[in-house]
Amino acid sequence: MAATARRGWGAAAVAAGLRRRFCHMLKNPYTIKKQPLHQFVQRPLFPLPAAFYHPVRYMFIQTQDTPNPNSLKFIPGKPVLETRTMDFPTPAAAFRSPLARQLFRIEGVKSVFFGPDFITVTKENEELDWNLLKPDIYATIMDFFASGLPLVTEETPSGEAGSEEDDEVVAMIKELLDTRIRPTVQEDGGDVIYKGFEDGIVQLKLQGSCTSCPSSIITLKNGIQNMLQFYIPEVEGVEQVMDDESDEKEANSP
C-alpha cells in the first residue's frame, strides 16, 4: 500500500511539473527559441578567408565565327553601340574608346570593331591561336562593363546617313544599304559604309571582319553589287575604297 501510494504521489508530481513547464511555454513561447532561424541560414558552414570575398562578375560572353578566320565575334549579351557601329583599324584610332584601347594592349590583336550588340576582334595572323587570345579578351570585356566607364569618349559618325542634298539615286542606295545590306554584313561581325557614287560606281568601305576577309571581293561583287543593281538600274558597279595608306598596302599585298 505504501509503495503504491508513493508511486501515485511521484506520478502526480511529475504531471504537475510538466503542466507548469507547459503553461510557462505557452506564456513565453520564445524561451525555446534560443536563436532566430535566419541566423543559421546566413551563417556559413565553412567560413572563407577575407581574401575570397569580392564582387562576382555575372556576364556570359558568347563567341561566333565569321567568314574571316582571323576575326571572331564576341557577344556580351548587352547593348554595345545599339544602333550604330565604330571601326578601330589601328591602335591610333582607338583613342576614342577606352575598351578599344584595352583590347589593343592584348598581344596579337590587329583591329577592333563595335557593332550594335557585338564586338569583333581581328588577330594579326592565322598562326595565332584563338584559344590563347580569348581568355584575355573575355577578361578585358568583362572588366570594362563592370567598371561602368563610357564605351566611347568622342562621338564620330559610323556611316553616311541620307540628307536633303542627296539626289534620288543616292538616297535609294543609302536606304538599301541601311535596310537590306548592312544588317546582313553585321551578322558576320562587320559593316559596310557608303563613301560615294560617281559615274555609276558605288564606293563602299568594308569594316570589321570584312576588312581582311578573303571573301570580301566576293561579298562586294556577288552580294552587294547584285542587290544594288537589281533594285537600282543606275548602279553599274561597286568598288572598295580605303581611308588610309595602311589599308591600301594591305589590299595590294599578296
From Swiss-Prot:
Name recorded for this polypeptide: NFU1 iron-sulfur cluster scaffold homolog, mitochondrial
Function: Iron-sulfur cluster scaffold protein which can assemble [4Fe-4S] clusters and deliver them to target proteins.
Chain spans, region NifU: 173-241
Cell location: Mitochondrion; Cytoplasm, Cytosol
Record disease entry: Multiple mitochondrial dysfunctions syndrome 1: A severe disorder of systemic energy metabolism, resulting in weakness, respiratory failure, lack of neurologic development, lactic acidosis, hyperglycinemia and early death. Some patients show failure to thrive, pulmonary hypertension, hypotonia and irritability. Biochemical features include severe combined deficiency of the 2-oxoacid dehydrogenases, defective lipoic acid synthesis and reduction in activity of mitochondrial respiratory chain complexes. Spastic paraplegia 93, autosomal recessive: A form of spastic paraplegia, a neurodegenerative disorder characterized by a slow, gradual, progressive weakness and spasticity of the lower limbs. Rate of progression and the severity of symptoms are quite variable. Initial symptoms may include difficulty with balance, weakness and stiffness in the legs, muscle spasms, and dragging the toes when walking. In some forms of the disorder, bladder symptoms (such as incontinence) may appear, or the weakness and stiffness may spread to other parts of the body.
Effect of R182W: In MMDS1; patient's skin fibroblasts show deficiency of lipoic acid synthase and reduced lipoic acid content
Outcome reported for the amino acid change (mutating L133P): In SPG93; uncertain significance
Effect of G189A: Alters protein structure. Increases likelihood of existing as monomer. Decreases ability to receive a Fe/S clusters from donor proteins. Decreases delivery rates of [2Fe-2S] cluster to target proteins
